[in-house]
Swiss-Prot record:
This is Probable disulfide formation protein. It comes from the Bacteria. Its main location: membrane. HAMAP family: BdbC. It comes from Chlamydia trachomatis serovar D (strain ATCC VR-885 / DSM 19411 / UW-3/Cx). The chain crosses the membrane at residues 7-26, 41-60, 67-84, 109-131. Keywords: Cell inner membrane, Cell membrane, Chaperone, Disulfide bond, Electron transport, Membrane, Oxidoreductase, Redox-active center, Transmembrane, Transmembrane helix, Transport. It is found in: Cell inner membrane.
Length: 135
């Protein structure tokens, strides 16, 4: 049963990357929320995952983990850093520009955008580690 579920990990990772990308685009272009610098860096890690994981899932190409796992882990690290900026008093980033990286915007009323981003990157990374080829 577990082996059967592991064959769908690439599809699930692709789904998480699609949802994250759609949320990012929705907040930026529909709700006109200007992203901070760290959000842009997270997007640099997330947006290519949609294409790469989509193709890999379609072709059942597990070897893609070599390329996608570093993107997911770097994105996760940036998201965790931004969570720390928001949650730890006194932490600031001087290069943020107009929009502060420590500004809290809540999704669904209880989770901040960097926390959601960290959860998505963590889920993608875990799914990539668990992914196996179906037989």
């Amino acid at each position: 049963m577990i082996k059967h579920l592991r064959s769908y990990c690439l599809y699930l990772a692709w789904l998480f990357s699609c949802i994250g990308t759609l949320m990012s685009v929705y907040y930026s272009y529909i709700l006109n929320v200007e992203p901070c610098l760290l959000c842009y860096y997270q997007r640099i890690c997330l947006f290519p995952l949609v294409v790469i994981l989509g193709i890999a899932a379609y072709r059942e190409d597990i070897s893609i983990k070599i390329y996608t796992l570093p993107l997911a882990l770097v994105g996760f690290g940036i998201a965790i850093y931004q969570v720390c900026l928001q949650e730890i008093p006194g932490m600031t980033l001087d290069i943020c520009g107009k929009v502060s990286c420590s500004t809290k915007l809540f999704l669904l009323g209880f989770i901040t955008m960097p926390m959601a981003s960290a959860a998505a990157f963590c889920a993608i990374a875990c799914l990539l580690v668990l992914a196996t080829k179906s037989k």
